[in-house]
Structure formats: C-alpha cells, structure tokens
Amino acid sequence: MDRAEAVALVRSKAEKETTVRHLITVEGVMRRLAVHFGEDPDTWGLVGLFHDIDQDQTHGDLERHARVGAGWLREAGVGETIVNAVLAHAHEQYRTDLVSRAIVPADAVTGFLVACALVRPEKASGMKVSSCRKKLKERSFAPGVNRDEIRGCEASIGLGVDELFALGIEGLESVADEVGLTA
C-alpha cells in the first residue's frame, strides 16, 4: 500500500481532523526513527500513520483499541509486520521487534513535541532539545502525555531521551506543513 492509499484509508476511518493530524505527525517521527535505525521508512511510516486509526471509534476502550484497526488493516491487505506494530501500540504482548517497540515512545514523544510546538510562535520550526527537556520536567505542561513512555525509550529502543527528542523534532519538522505546524 502506498502512502496516498494509506492516507485515504485513514481519512475513511478517522472521524476527526485532529486524529488525522496526529497520525501524520507520528508517521513523520516513525519515518525519522526508521532512517536512524537503518530500517524501511515506508514500513515504519505506515505504522505511525495507522497506529490510532480506530481511535475515534474505540473512544478509549483499551481492550478494543488497536484490535479494531488491525482488523481494518488486514481487510485492506496491510502486511502483518505493520498490523503487529499497530497492535503493539496498545497491547504490550505484541512488542516483539524494534518497530513494534518504537511506536510507543514515538507516539508519546510526538504528542509532547506537538504540545511544545503549539506554544511557540515559530511552531515546529527551530525547536530545541533543551527546551523540550525543560518542559518535560513541568508536570502541568501536556499532562496527558505519558512521560514514562518517553523516558523508557532507552530500555525499549536504545535511545536516550535527548536523542529521541532530536529525532522526533526532525520528524515533526518533516510534516509540519502538512499538519499546520508552521508559523
């Protein structure tokens, strides 16, 4: 499945434009992580693009979340590597390879970085790791972001938090125009 088909599938399932923007931003971060790890950015990008495809339908039902989306992806002919990583996003037992472990900190750091971008006049342009690190310590900033998933990146994928921030910023900048995060 190429990206245009994948975006069309996402748009057919997502009920909110905010969901689509979230999926595209996580896609950008996953593509950047793939390049860093010498993996296929198209595969990793699709994992990011699809990871919350059922978010608007499952409405926080953690048992169904990702399982509904996995069913849609299988029906659309998406490969099991991608489907497994989508399941891994919400169900730990599926975290069996690097891409399925990477989606967890990638999702969390993307949400955090988007929050950082939204409070800056320049939005995603020119974000600095040091500023993000400082904001991470502020519990009142982006309180919905699971900071443990960000801090756990060293154990899960072998990256320090600063490195995850740096790669995440690059990934976010790569899709900033598409998701409205430019000044």
PLM feature segments, named:
Residues 1-61:
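Acidic/His-rich, divalent-metal-binding segments that scaffold phosphate/diphosphate chemistry
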Residues 14, 124, 129-131, 136-183:
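C-terminal binding/interaction regions
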Residues 16, 99-102, 162:
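Amphipathic, non-membrane alpha-helical segments in soluble helical-bundle scaffolds
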Residues 7, 11, 24-27, 31, ...:
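Predominant activation on well-ordered alpha-helical scaffold segments within soluble catalytic domains
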Residues 11, 31, 35, 74, ...:
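Short polybasic/polar patches that bind polyanions
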Residues 37-139, 151:
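Divalent metal-dependent catalytic cores for phosphoryl transfer on phosphate-bearing substrates
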